[in-house]
UniProtKB/Swiss-Prot annotation:
Domain notes: The DCUN1 domain, also known as PONY domain, mediates the interaction with different cullins. The DCUN1 domain mediates the interaction with the N-terminally acetylated NEDD8-conjugating E2s enzyme leading to the NEDD8 transfer from N-terminally acetylated NEDD8-conjugating E2s enzyme to different cullin C-terminal domain-RBX complexes; the neddylation efficiency correlates with the DCUN1D5-cullin and DCUN1D5-E2 interaction affinities.
Segments forming domain DCUN1: 46-232
Consequence recorded when altering A219R: Does not affect phosphorylarion at Ser-41
Compartments in which it is found: Nucleus; Cytoplasm, Cytoskeleton, Spindle
GO aspect biological process, one term: regulation of cell growth
UniProt function note: Contributes to the neddylation of all cullins by transferring NEDD8 from N-terminally acetylated NEDD8-conjugating E2s enzyme to different cullin C-terminal domain-RBX complexes which is necessary for the activation of cullin-RING E3 ubiquitin ligases (CRLs). May play a role in DNA damage response and may participate in cell proliferation and anchorage-independent cell growth.
Lineage: Eukaryota, Metazoa, Chordata, Craniata, Vertebrata
Keywords: Cytoplasm, Cytoskeleton, Nucleus, Phosphoprotein
GO cellular component, one term: spindle
A GO MF term: cullin family protein binding
Gene that this sequence comes from: Dcun1d5
Record text on subunit structure and interactions: Part of a complex that contains DCUN1D5, CUL1 and RBX1; this interaction is bridged by CUL1. Interacts (via the DCUN1 domain) with the unneddylated cullins: interacts with CUL1, CUL2, CUL3, CUL4A, CUL4B and CUL5; these interactions promote the cullin neddylation and the identity of the cullin dictates the affinity of the interaction. Interacts (via DCUN1 domain) with UBE2M (N-terminally acetylated form) and probably with UBE2F (N-terminally acetylated form).
Protein name: DCN1-like protein 5
Coiled-coil residue spans: none
């Protein structure tokens, strides 16, 4: 989960693919090597008091974990801010804004996860990652990411943020992602609305990589119609 300071789009890290004659498309990694979590003796019960004290290690005077606190939190748990596990954690906490955790979000989410310290959260990493492999949970995470990442005074995602979030969510699983990314790079689109965002996931799950089963008369957004047309022209040129 990228840490927002001035609501700039998160960086796009880890290379995905390079199309002939076109620039490389890069995406962030799913995970980095994690330091081994210390064993927690005796299956300790969850402590709300301990969880709250843990929260205040990172929160500011406004009782919110902001960008600086988030960076320290990520460092302590051994996860890069742009790692997808941070997005899954934010989803579990039902965090409203990227780069911020309120006290209410922290307590509700960490109580659900039964985590009141760094070691317990590290022991839940495999569970958090497993949510990405569940079709229903992944769809919920994907949809959550739209509102999580957008500026709250805007109804749409700016295109740079959309590209970065799509890279994080679909970059390793959708065969056409690098091509779609290149299409967005050269397109006229400067924002992506919620309907377009939702349909990109459906498109990635149902349309073949060669586009052979794409229904031009289907109820796809114009953005995807234009993408298919653009790609077919490239394939025949």
């Amino acid at each position: 989960m990228p840490v927002k300071k001035k609501r700039k789009a998160p960086g796009v890290a880890a290379a995905v693919a390079e199309d002939a004659g076109l620039k490389k498309c890069k995406i962030p990694s799913y995970c980095r090597s994690q330091p081994p979590a210390r064993l927690i003796s005796g299956e300790e019960d969850f402590s709300r008091k301990k969880c709250l004290a843990w929260f205040y290690e990172y929160a500011g005077p406004d009782e919110v974990v902001g960008p600086e606190g988030m960076e320290k939190f990520c460092e302590d748990i051994g996860v890069e801010p742009e790692n997808i596990i941070m997005l899954v954690l934010a989803w579990k906490l039902e965090a409203e804004s990227m780069g911020f955790f309120t006290k209410e979000e922290w307590l509700k989410g960490m109580t659900s996860l039964q985590c009141d310290c760094t070691e317990k959260l590290q022991s839940r990493f495999d569970f958090l990652r497993s949510q990405l492999n569940d079709i229903s949970s992944f769809k919920n995470i994907y949809r959550y990411a739209f509102d999580f990442a957008r500026d709250k005074d805007q109804r749409s995602l700016d295109i740079d943020t959309a590209k970065s979030m799509l890279a994080l969510l679909l970059g390793r699983t959708w065969p056409l992602f690098s091509v779609f990314y290149q299409y967005l790079e050269q397109s006229k689109y400067r924002v992506m609305n919620k309907d377009q965002w939702y349909n990109v996931l459906e498109f990635s799950r149902t349309v073949h990589a060669d586009l052979s089963n794409y229904d031009e008369d289907g109820a796809w957004p114009v953005l995807l119609d234009e993408f298919v047309e653009w790609q077919k022209i490239r394939q025949t040129s």
